[in-house]
Each structure stands twice: as C-alpha cells, then as structure tokens.
Amino acid sequence: MDTLLNTLLNNPMIFLAGALGGLLGVIVSYRELGKIIRVIRTPTSEIGALPLDEQVEIVGKADSEMIINSPITKKTCILWQVEVSEKRGSGKRSRWVTVYSNTSTKSFDVYDGTGKVQIFPNRLTELILRDDVRESSGVFNSLDEGIQIALKDLGVDTEGFLIFNKNMRVYERYIEQGDQIYVLGKMSSKNGIKLMDGESSPLIISDQSELRVLGRFFWRVVINALLGAVIGIALFLYFTNR
C-alpha cells in the first residue's frame, strides 16, 4: 500500500491521467450537469404567477379526481413507479439486470394557495421518489406472497431453475393524494388551463426537496468523475508498465 502511494505521489503523470479521466467523466455527465443548471437557474414560483412558455419550478400538493392503484401493493395513489431487477451470472461476473420497469401516466394536479397546474407525466419523465416498497429475494428466501402474485400478473417470473427463487429486487414508489411534491418543467396553457408535460421539455417530478434533487444529480456527476479518474490511472499504469 505504501509503495503504491509513493508511486502516485512521485509521478505527476499519474495525477494528470487521473485528472483527464475525471474530466472525461464530467463531460460524459453533460445531461446531469444540464439538469443541475436548470434547477439552479429556475426559481421556485407561486402557481398563480407562473409565466407561460418558460421553464418553471413549483412546489405544491398533489391532487387528482382519478385515483389509481399501484401494481405491487395496490396502494391508492395518483402516480406510481415500479422497478424489478434480477441478479444474473455468478461470482465476479454477476450483475443486476432490470427485467421490468414501468410508470403510470395518468395526469394529476398540483396546487398551492395561489392556483393549480395540471401535470402530464410520460415515459420520459424523470421521477426522483423515495422507495415506499423495497423487497428482495434469494435462493432460500421468498418475496411476500402478495408481491409474487402481483409480479406474476405483470409477467415477471420469480422462480428459476428447479423452482428455486431468483435473486430479485423489487422497488415500488408512489405519490399519494395530498403529498407535497416538486416539479420542474415548461409551463404551457390549453383552453385556459395551465399545464406541464414532458413533450416540449424534460419534466422532473420528485417527492423530495429541491436540495435533495440537486444532490441526486450532483452525486451522479461525482461518481462518473471518480470512475473516469480510476480508469485513467489504470490505463496509464497499464501502458507504462508493459
């Protein structure tokens, strides 16, 4: 460990390789950087004072006349998201693969003391939600029976070879009536009704604070930068020691 540390400290080219790799990681994260800039540059506004055809940021209560049920726990809500992943392979070659992912697209309202706006989520909408349900299974431990039935209805098989359980992770997230949410997107109007959708501009919906949303995007950039730095250093050491 000391030898490796001394090598790193005494060879500035290693730092340069790491810096270049980190910079490449940041460049690859240009989408996340764009989101960070959008969040920072867009002030939170009262719904009643929102300008049309501009990027806006709102915080308000979720509401809808059309209540739906989440597919896993059948929770009454106005928006849900489900992700199911399965561990495939073994040892160092094992990896988690998403086998099912879906999001509801029913419209709903967000209101504050000054007005309301109709939200139209779609498949491209970015949801940053807390995990309301987080379950996992392994060879010798099963998912809850109700979750197994729900997954079967969704076309997801929880059993593998010789009826052993698959290694799976199940996440369900939802927004309930009255939950406070954060929305960032472009404001428009149709027949006098204010609305935001993901067609004309990317839509971000979260049940967390603006600061936590920023944190999520920031750490994605940091992770990519660190990975880039590690790869840069590894490539430098590989080619210089051949």
Per-range role (PLM):
Residues 1-9:
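Short, strongly hydrophobic alpha-helical membrane anchors
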Residues 9-15, 219-224:
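N-terminal Sec-pathway targeting helices
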Residues 13-31, 229-232:
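Alpha-helical membrane-embedded segments
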Residues 34-69:
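OB-fold nucleic-acid-binding modules
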Residues 55-90:
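Juxtamembrane non-transmembrane segments of integral membrane proteins
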Residues 78-184, 188-193, 212-220:
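Charged, low-complexity helical/coil segments in non-catalytic cytosolic or luminal regions
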Residues 199-228:
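Cytosolic-side membrane-insertion boundary helix
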Residues 232-242:
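Juxtamembrane boundary at the C-terminal end of a transmembrane helix
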